[in-house]
Amino acid sequence: MARDEDLGALFARVTRRLIEAERPLLAARGLSMWAYVALTRLVEGPAPTQIALAEQMGYDKTRLIAILDRLADEGLVERTPDPEDRRARIVQLTAAGRARHLQARSDIRTMESEMLDGLSDTEQAMLREMLGRLASAAG
């Protein structure tokens, strides 16, 4: 057991394992990790602009354009001109994007359940709650 291990080291080990497990699940759905993150943010509602979406994701705005281009080409997102700023684009999830995200999230939740099999349902819920609070506090 790693009771004395620093939180950063513990998070790094778990994060690495989660990413290794998620990557093939997302690839099977035709998504990269960052494309999935973008869809996840858009499930919460349309992004006021592409720049705002990049900020919400903590991702480089210039690199996000290529991801959004691909998602738009696949019909998963729509970008429309911002009526208040012709240079800006509003990003919205399409029904196909919502469905693809739901499929990917279901795959990930199944994997997470298997990974957390050693924890009770209550412990799993507590872990998710605490991690959510930590993530919110971190920004």
Predicted segments — roles?
Residues 11, 39-42, 131:
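Hydrophobic structural patches
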Residues 19, 47, 51, 69-132:
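Charged, amphipathic alpha-helical coiled-coil/dimerization segments
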Residues 66:
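Conserved alpha-helix in the HATPase_c
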Residues 16, 20-63:
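N-terminal helix-turn-helix DNA-binding core of bacterial DNA-binding proteins
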Residues 136-139:
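Short, charged, intrinsically disordered terminal tails
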Residues 1-29, 117:
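N-terminal leader segment of winged-helix/HTH proteins
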